[in-house]
Amino acid sequence: MKDKKQKITVIFGIICAVIIGVCLVIQFVIKKEDKKLQKEKEKLEILTIKTESGIEIETEYYSFNNSKFYLKIPKSFKQLDYETIAKKYNGNVPNIVFSNEETTINVAVSLTDNEMSNTQIKSFKETMENLLKDNSEIISSDLYEVNKYNIGKIKLISNAQDTSIYNNMIFFSYNDKLVIVTFNCTTELQKEWQSVGDFIIDSLFFKE
């Protein structure tokens, strides 16, 4: 009888220890998730970024084509009309382009009709890298998630007619269609504006 009581006590102790352990793990996960949400909230609220030389750039959120994805766009940038976009870009013309006065710094968004699922983004990124590396210098590439959307990213230097262009490009699936967003500037402006480009590209978020 005594042994039986001891066994029950041991089992009860183990159960209590397991319950306490589970509670601690749950608390840790909740705190971690709260910190993550707080960090994301703070990121969304920051609307200013400085260039390398310290010039403060003020941005505002822009929703593209009434879609439920948003990017921070510098307030000083102007949206180009179709004729200007067509002259500036050869081949696949973006739907929307925001530029500085000199049109040397741009944020371009292509809302394509190409079928693309969320799960295809990884293979599309790899295909793009293979295509681009022949005529461009690939700086880096990445694959990550934003609000459960897979995002492919490629940074590269491409050649234009009389200069070289720094590109920070992301692509993702929205409504099962491919969307491409690119921040670009001439390589002469890359050092000054690269952090601003990162700020713009990394500001992407989706609202359900």
Regions found by a protein language model. Give the residues of each.
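Envelope-exposed proteins and targeting segments
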Residues: 67-69, 73, 94, 150, ...
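Extracytoplasmic/secreted envelope proteins and their assembly/folding machinery
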Residues: 74, 121, 125, 129, ...
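Short, well-structured beta-strand
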Residues: 147-208
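Short beta-strand micro-motifs in enzyme catalytic cores
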Residues: 60, 94-96, 150-154
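N-terminal targeting sequences that direct proteins away from the cytosol to non-cytosolic compartments
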Residues: 2-93, 184-208
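A short acidic-to-branched-hydrophobic micro-motif
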Residues: 94-123
